[in-house]
Structure formats: structure tokens, C-alpha cells
Amino acid sequence: MTEYPNNLPKKKKYKISSLGKTARFRSYEDSFVWLNEAMIVNACFNATDPSVGLALSSDHSTQKCYMADTGLLVTQAFMSGKYTENDLYRSVLFDKLNINEGMITENVVAQMLRAGGHRLYFYSRSDSRERENHMEIDFLITQKNRIAPIEVKSGNYRSHISLDKFRRRFSQKIGKSYILYDKDVCVKDGIIHLPLYMAQLL
């Protein structure tokens, strides 16, 4: 667990093959299920063919594992530093630390979506020959009879290329599309932009 903060930003997706050439998900499945059910991690599975039944196309051998307690993640990330506890949190609050905000922000959103009753899914497809097919969506949820893609942005983002590609490719299956970021509510180009704290309302 102490290595978790170090690994989270390096590999967004956890591949079982990283454990060894002959590693198979079925050999480690019970361990991942235990971590998820013990609320130590929030597992997020790749939905390879997104539809209302996200579980039907979920690839459990490729998953993201978010820490279930973001406060614990931040504490573990800096527990070996020179900061006293109060100094650390003050530095985080006032943006005086050079940290991977994207990693922590995505972890916060995963925690809020799980607390809101959603199972976590994402979409990832790599295609070096056809750039239009190369994309990654941070989270997918279902709303009524449609899927809703969610992109999480930290800092001053300027584009959402993967979300645009996803909306073109799966336009018949998508209802609302969301970007969660650190600014006010607005709608741009058919995408609903919401402050990060509103993830709990989705």
C-alpha cells in the first residue's frame, strides 16, 4: 500500500501481465475483489463495447484501481516529506506543492461516483494506425437508457479530443456528456461542464 501513490500516476490502467508473463487475471481475481469489497480501492473496468449494459463488455483484466480514501492517498503521498501535518494540508489547499493534480482529481471523482452508487467503468482503445480510434474516456456511467461519458480536467485544460472522438463514434448510445473541472457550470458544444464537487450528483 505504501507504493500505491507512486504507481497511480504512472499507469492509469493496471494490466495483470505486469505481474509476470504467465500471469492471468483468474489467478489474482479474488485479491482484486477483496480489495474492492473491503473498500480499500475503487476498481474501474474497461468497457470495450460501451452500451447501457456496461458490465456486459467490461474487461476485468484491464482496470484502473483508485484509492477509496483520497485523504489517505494524499497523506501517503507525502508521509515521508519534511512537512508537519498542518503545513502539508495548508500547502495542498493553497496550491503551493508541485503535485500531479490530475491523479488526485481523478481519484476524488472516482470516490464521489462510487459513493453515489455507480460502478466504475472507463473506455480505452489504442490504435496507432487510425488516430480517430485512439481515445480514452475517464469514466462511463449509465443514465436511464443511455451512457454518459465523463472527462475529468484539472488546471487550465483547452481541449477534449478523446471525448469528441467518443461522441462521434458512439453518438447513437450517448445521452449527456460531461466535463468535470474547477470552474462554473456551463454548456459548450453540447457538453455539460460541471464543477468537480457536482460529481456526487450524477
List PLM regions with ranges.
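Conserved helicase/translocase motor-coupling segment
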Residues: M1-E37
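A cross-kingdom feature that marks ATP-driven nucleic-acid transaction machinery
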Residues: D30-L202
